[in-house]
């Protein structure tokens, strides 16, 4: 009897050890998986850190302003609007007050409002900005659903003060710093572009501060395992629609089902973010998100949910599918066409890509000369994140505020084709 109990005890002890071992294996597996996920969002160091903790923003009062004495109205009651106040100066002129969401802030004095009158008349609008800021954008007009730049003879400048003349009627005219491309407009565009293309999956990186979707287009043919990754970004800064148009043209070219595109997408994977800052876009912000931060300074510690979730999506895709991130293109707008590049290229994913790419642009766009500004990123911007975080090529692709749309389309098309040619035929995976 005693021997039987001893054997039973030994068996129970062995079973407990085996059970404890299995638990240990499960714990280690979970820990390693968690470690991997934490690693995916590790911060990237920059020489000049920027405080990107949330700051308050000033929301504009959404309303229709009625100047009864003049019979003129103006409204900011639509997505992408920016009108802080509307004040009658005399029977033919009103002051348009434009304030940013907070400050300090880049001089990107964005405005957008609808205006109309009770009877046909010419009327003048004088723009007023806070001290230290001045008028940047040539007004664009949306009349009968068509956008056009204002007639230059209807713009009057006195020192830094800008006044415009509009011929008003009961039919509203939409006046904006740049053509409006709200989050709804962006969704309508990419939904139409990817329709019928089974190799494109529309996903979500997460939600903005206000709960708006941050869409992602995941693009590849065949198995995504081990495919090298190219990341495309735009609309970190709300008013920068000319950069967004280049992004559109670039992506549409990749999705044009050409022979080149087919070979490219069987070899590489595109992860594209068509609107990184949906809150800022729809609120008519000059530059920041609803957290009051320039998102293109948050690529180090990811204090803002938009960048945190974009980074998580990119790095998780790279790790889960064992695909190296080799190139990041971030589409923006500024006062002129320019490519901001990193000086460091040796020992990166593609040391010669930029030289090949720029040569291809100049060779295939008549009369075009690349404007490059090269410098390793000191502040936490996306192009620096690609370099310092992934040893990848990072480029900020800037289009001028007033670059004609037909030129933007051509540059987007050619730059996409040249990228695909280089990656398929010259720099092979």
Spans of model-derived segments:
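Active-site/substrate-binding loop(s) of hydrolase catalytic cores
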Residues: 199-215, 219-220, 224-363, 367, ...
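Bacterial Sec-dependent N-terminal signal peptides
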Residues: 1-45
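Short secondary-structure junctions
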Residues: 149-153, 198-204, 366-376
